[in-house]
């Protein structure tokens, strides 16, 4: 593609198309695409979703966008509002740098503690019942702000909230870390 933003849109469109295809459903069986990205007006998600014949909910939650799409999609299915949802997100290192830090065109030197935004896209289809992975619970995190303002070290800004959310989840669910095969966080 000619721009980083168009490349991100193409990646997300491809991820959505592949997720629907691998689910064994056709596009007309999808009731909603729930997606987000890091760009202004979530344009990658919006432009990717416009190619599909279903509703679209655009979400923005920075590094936690994919988790938010799963929570919203699961709640809509569990509530009986929809039957099938695509949950998706994307990011592109170069478009994120342009928007949040230093445009690559400036040739700025990156500080050693700066994080690297992934260039990639992912999507899955949520449906009630069936085989495979199950969404059984969600814990919505709260903001824990220690006053970190360094745009090159957002991991330090996000880590307290991520830790607080995990601790809250274990307390509320009565589970322990060893009850899980894998614990991952979208936070840096």
Task: For the regions a language model picked out, list residue spans one by one.
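Internal helical hairpin/lid segments
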Residues: 182-188
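Active-site-proximal alpha-helical scaffold in enzymes
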Residues: 13, 60-87, 126, 160, ...
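Acidic, glycine-rich active-site loops and adjacent beta-strand->loop/helix elements
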Residues: 36-41, 63-64, 89-95, 141
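Active-site nucleophile and cofactor-binding loops and adjacent substrate-binding regions
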Residues: 6-8, 55-67, 114-116
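A glycine- and small-aliphatic-rich helix-loop capping segment at beta-alpha/alpha-beta transitions
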Residues: 45-55, 77-78, 100-109
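Condensing-enzyme catalytic core mediating Claisen C-C bond formation in acyl metabolism
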Residues: 1-5, 103-167, 172-175
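Conserved active-site "lid/cap" helical segment
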Residues: 1-34, 38-44, 51, 161-177
């Amino acid at each position: 593609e000619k721009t980083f933003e168009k490349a991100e849109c193409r990646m997300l469109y491809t991820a959505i198309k592949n997720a629907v295809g691998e689910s064994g459903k056709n596009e007309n069986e999808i009731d909603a695409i729930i997606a987000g990205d890091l760009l202004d007006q979530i344009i990658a998600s919006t432009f990717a979703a416009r190619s599909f014949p279903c509703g679209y909910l655009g979400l923005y939650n920075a590094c936690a966008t994919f988790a938010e799409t799963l929570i919203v999609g699961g709640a809509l299915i569990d509530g009986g509002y929809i039957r099938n949802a695509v949950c998706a997100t994307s990011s592109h290192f170069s478009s994120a740098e342009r928007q949040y830090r230093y445009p690559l065109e400036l040739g700025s030197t990156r500080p050693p503690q700066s994080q690297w935004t992934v260039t990639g896209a992912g999507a899955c289809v949520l449906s009630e019942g069936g085989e495979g992975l199950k969404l059984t619970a969600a814990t919505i995190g709260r903001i824990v702000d220690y006053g970190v303002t360094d745009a090159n070290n957002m991991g330090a800004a996000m880590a307290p909230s991520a830790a607080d959310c995990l601790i809250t989840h274990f307390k509320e669910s009565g589970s322990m870390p060893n009850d899980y095969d894998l614990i991952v966080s979208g936070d840096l």
